[in-house]
Amino acid sequence: MISYHVQQMGGSGKVVFNQRTGEIVMTQYQGSCFCGAVKFQVSGAPEAMGYCHCDSCRRWSAGPVNAFSLWPYDSFEVLAGADHIGEFHLTEQSYRKWCKKCGGHVFTDHPALSLMDVYVANLPDLAFEPAVHVHYQESVLPIRDGLPKMKDVPAEMGGSGDTLPE
């Protein structure tokens, strides 16, 4: 029988170890809205992390850029407050979710991709390791960090796959 050990990380993150081998089996991160009514958890590793510069994300986040982490549906779970989640569809590609009690934006469902975009600011224990900028053609804040700057999104996500210079 395999025995597992759960170790609390700083904050709400957890690492699950195989006690026999010491191998990390799974990492879990928890997040919430401002008031804590909506709580959620992601497990494992995100499919991608980066920055989105699209007009929609900028307006939704009220900032010049949005830091994202994309998770497969089976890695994402609402732990509490599902009845407090509001939803807005500007496009069929993005179903934006927020807490109806405090107004805090929590995540965006991308049904065509079967991915949940959990805003990095809502996962305080996640080590943010951005790999790409998407929708950079819409950028209002040029960032020179050496990461690829996608005109829209990667081809495997339905975009052109074209990159732009820094």
Model-identified regions with their sequence ranges:
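A short Gly-Trp-Pro
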Residues: 3-166
